[in-house]
Each structure stands twice: as C-alpha cells, then as structure tokens.
A protein has these predicted regions:
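Short, surface-exposed patches at the edges or C-terminal ends of soluble domains, predominantly
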Residues: 1-173
Length: 173
C-alpha cells in the first residue's frame, strides 16, 4: 500500500464530480518483449498500487480501470486515439503504458507514457493531471479593433527612437 501526500489528498477531497482513471498497460506484450520491457512489470505494479490508493481514499469519486490493449482490439484503438505512445515489440504486439483521466463532462487528460525517469514524480504527475481535468479553465478573450484600445506595445528602445523623431507611443485608453 502506498501513502498519498497531503497535496494529493487535498486534490481528491475537492473532487466535485466522478472521474475515471484508465490505466493502459500491455502486460501480455511486455512478457514477450526483451528484459528492458519486462522491467516495466515492476513499475506497472507500483503505478497500479498508487492508483488503487487514489481510488480507495476518494469515497467513490475515482473509478480505476486497468486495460491491456491487445493487437487490433478496440482497447488498442482507444489507446492510440487518446494519444498514448506505442512501442512495437514484435510484428503483432505493441507496448503501451499510460494513463487517461476522464471526467463526466468529457474532459480528458493524458500521460502518454510512464517514463521510468519520472518514477519519483509519478504521484505529482497523476495529481496534476487530475487537478487540471477537474479545474475549469478561464475563458480567454481578445480585442479586435482598428482603434488603439490597448495602446502601442513598444519596447523601451522603440519608445526612445519614436521620441527622438518627435513621436509619442499611443497610451492605452
């Protein structure tokens, strides 16, 4: 069992909608691959137990699905559609190891591949993914006008050059 950090628990506590964590791991493909790929079985067990801990402390707000994408299957097609990285092992088998976070409102965030170099940061990466999936993005607006509504955005150098020529940069309204 893995103990989650206080920051992760805070993110889980502020969940206002159920989310699904889809862990894609090509377990059968990994067994057919070279030793470097088989190493991922240990890393997979670590990530899976971590995600199970997320699920257990979430009061039913997190649903974990573990998916082994087999060749030419719907799961493999979904993994590719979500942007997960695939690594060919044999002519038939591809290796996948990634995560998709889905909200009930259709927001999807992805870790395309769990890199061993980021193993020390995997809890942070997952928590960040969940937080960005459930946090509404602020809307961005733009101003389109032929009038100098926002003023002239010029560098200090350009402002000096304009002053030398007797011109003044336009201030914002």
């Amino acid at each position: 069992i893995y103990t989650l950090s206080d920051g992760t628990k805070n993110i889980i506590d502020k969940l206002n909608q159920p989310i699904t964590l889809k862990l894609y791991y090509a377990e059968k493909a990994a067994m057919k691959g070279p030793d470097k790929i088989r190493f991922f079985n240990i890393y997979y067990d670590f990530v899976k137990s971590l995600l199970e801990e997320y699920e257990s402390v979430s009061d039913g707000m997190i649903n974990l699905e573990v998916i082994d994408p087999r060749p030419y299957s719907e799961a493999e097609t979904e993994a590719l559609a979500h942007g997960l990285k695939k690594f060919p092992i044999t002519e038939e088998e591809n290796f996948f190891f990634g995560l998709v976070v889905q909200t009930q409102f259709g927001v999807e965030k992805t870790i395309p591949f769990f890199s061993p170099e980021r193993q020390d940061f995997v809890e942070y990466d997952i928590s960040y993914l969940i937080d960005t999936a459930i946090t509404r993005e602020k809307k961005k607006i733009g101003v389109v006008s032929s009038l100098p509504v926002t003023g002239q955005d010029v560098s200090d150098y350009m402002a000096r050059m304009m002053r030398m020529q007797g011109q003044q940069p336009e201030p914002a309204w």
